[in-house]
C-alpha cells in the first residue's frame, strides 16, 4: 500500500511529552529496564511509524508493548482494528481508558490482551492480525519479532522500532560485519529492510542508544516450506553455524552432522563450499542444507 493510500482520520488527540509524564504519574508508572520501557512522546514520530507501516483501514494491526498509548492512538487514526498485547498489568488496565478519553469515537476499535508477547499464540488473540506495528521492548525485540512471524502466518507485514544496532543486524546482507543469526532467521519469513532512523529525544526516559525502523514483508509465495518442523530444522543449522562464527562450516556444523566429514558431504550436496563461513550464506543456502539432513 502506498503512503498516499494511508489517510488519517485525525480523531485522536496524540500524546506529547507533558501528557506522557502526566499519565505515568497518574497511573503510578515508572519505566523499567526489565521490561524495556521507553515511551514515545513525539506525535510526528508515531505518525511517521504508521505511515512507514503502510497500513490501511482494512488491516487488523497487532501492537506489542503499547505502553501509555502514543502509537496506539496514531494507529487508531488509520485502521479500524488494533489488538494491543501488553505484559504490564497497570498499563494494560489503563490503555482503554486513555483511548476513550483521547479518542472516544475510536475506542471501540481497540482490544487489549494482557500477555507476554514471547508466549502469545494465535488462539490468544481476539482477531487475526494482518500487520505488526510496534515499538518493541529492546531487551527482547528479536525473539518477539521472530516468535510472532512464526506464530501468526496472517501477518503480511511488520514495521518495528528497535535499537539501531539491532535494526542493522536484522536488515544486514550476507558477508557484512553485522550479518548474523537475526538476519538469517528474519529472512526466512520475508524480505527485510531498514525503514528509517529515530533519535533518542523522542522517548521518555531518554535511552542511551539510537533507534531504527525495520520493515519485514512476508513472502507472498514462500520459496520454501514454512511449517514449524521445517523452520526448526533450518534454525538449528543457523544456530550451529554462528555458534562458532570464525570456523569453517565443515568444522562449525560437525556437531549437527555427526562429524566433519558428514558435514562436508551435506554441504557439498547443497552446493555450499565447506570452507566457507556461516556469515557468507543467505537464508536460501541454509534451507538447501536442511534438505540434506
Swiss-Prot record:
Reaction catalysed by this enzyme: adenosine(1518)/adenosine(1519) in 16S rRNA + 4 S-adenosyl-L-methionine = N(6)-dimethyladenosine(1518)/N(6)-dimethyladenosine(1519) in 16S rRNA + 4 S-adenosyl-L-homocysteine + 4 H(+)
Source superkingdom: Bacteria
Coiled-coil spans in chain: none
Gene Ontology molecular-function annotations: 16S rRNA (adenine(1518)-N(6)/adenine(1519)-N(6))-dimethyltransferase activity; RNA binding
GO cellular component: cytosol
Binding site for S-adenosyl-L-methionine: 38, 40, 65, 86, 116, 135
Enzyme class: transferase
Protein role: Specifically dimethylates two adjacent adenosines (A1518 and A1519) in the loop of a conserved hairpin near the 3'-end of 16S rRNA in the 30S particle. May play a critical role in biogenesis of 30S subunits.
Family matches, as Gene3D superfamilies: Ribosomal RNA adenine dimethylase-like, domain 2 (1.10.8.100), Vaccinia Virus protein VP39 (3.40.50.150)
Protein name according to UniProt: Ribosomal RNA small subunit methyltransferase A
UniProt subcellular location: Cytoplasm
Keyword S-adenosyl-L-methionine: yes
Segments passing through the bilayer: none
